[in-house]
Amino acid sequence: MIVPKISERFEHCRARQRCALIPFLTAGDPDLETTVAALKILDDHGADLIELGMPYSDPLADGPVIQAAATRALQRGTRLEAVLEMTTDLHQQLTAPLILFSYYNPIYHRGVSSFLKAVAQAGIKGLVIPDLPLEEAEPVLAETANLGLELTLLIAPTTSPERMRAIATASQGFIYLVSTTGVTGMRQEMASRVQELLHTLRQITPKPIGVGFGIASPEHARQVRDWGADAAIVGSAFVKRLAEPDQGLAAVAEFCQSLRTALDTP
């Protein structure tokens, strides 16, 4: 199976007027075998792309749910080599392109070129590096383009319009719009400022826009769709469900299907 690039998957969704669903999981929580099973379930229940978080000891952008998942995964010995070995074996069984979510420190220590080549060879199609500022992204962007990877950059509610334009121009695959200041995690309601930010970005760029941080329910997903998002990115709500010892995989399947149904309902 030939897995499409991230930008190609968004073109496919746009042609069908489909808001993409992008679930997030932490690799290795509770273990890599469960991660494999969960990725297959997400792929079977309506995920268009899937973010796979590389566990890190100091995840500054992540809230308590994903921080705890990263700690558990690291305690079980989850390392990059094992995660890439897993995706090498798995990616051709999935229709959803995989996006690796990784902080910059592990990339820097391995060496940018070495890291990116290993990721590309493992069948991963894109990267999100939440602590990589635009000013330092150019070397990574140049290498990802040569390897067939796409590096997606983040825009926050506090980003100025001028900086939004620069980030939107540089970002590959899609633009990751952070819905709120602060860390990842489930919110009671979506900030109405997201609608304004989406409108502003639409005037700047034709690139797809995914909204993440805080989407915790089918209603939230439908709301960002109605506000004009091209994708709903859902992390903590999936990670929390997968952490349930007895019903984790079943809960992930049910929740993914509920999000897909909400996004497909006019």
Curated annotation (Swiss-Prot):
GO terms for molecular function: tryptophan synthase activity. This is Tryptophan synthase alpha chain. GO terms for cellular component: cytosol. It comes from Thermosynechococcus vestitus (strain NIES-2133 / IAM M-273 / BP-1). Pfam families: Trp_syntA. Its EC number is 4.2.1.20. HAMAP family: Trp_synth_alpha (MF_00131). The active site is at 51 (proton acceptor), 62 (proton acceptor). The alpha subunit is responsible for the aldol cleavage of indoleglycerol phosphate to indole and glyceraldehyde 3-phosphate. InterPro entries: Aldolase_TIM, RibuloseP-bd_barrel, Trp_synthase_alpha_AS, Trp_synthase_suA. Keywords: Amino-acid biosynthesis, Aromatic amino acid biosynthesis, Lyase, Tryptophan biosynthesis. It is an enzyme of class 4 (lyase). Pathway: Amino-acid biosynthesis; L-tryptophan biosynthesis; L-tryptophan from chorismate: step 5/5. NCBIfam families: trpA. The keyword Lyase applies. SUPFAM superfamilies: Ribulose-phoshate binding barrel. It catalyses: (1S,2R)-1-C-(indol-3-yl)glycerol 3-phosphate + L-serine = D-glyceraldehyde 3-phosphate + L-tryptophan + H2O. Tetramer of two alpha and two beta chains. Disulfide bonds: none annotated. PROSITE patterns: TRP_SYNTHASE_ALPHA (PS00167).
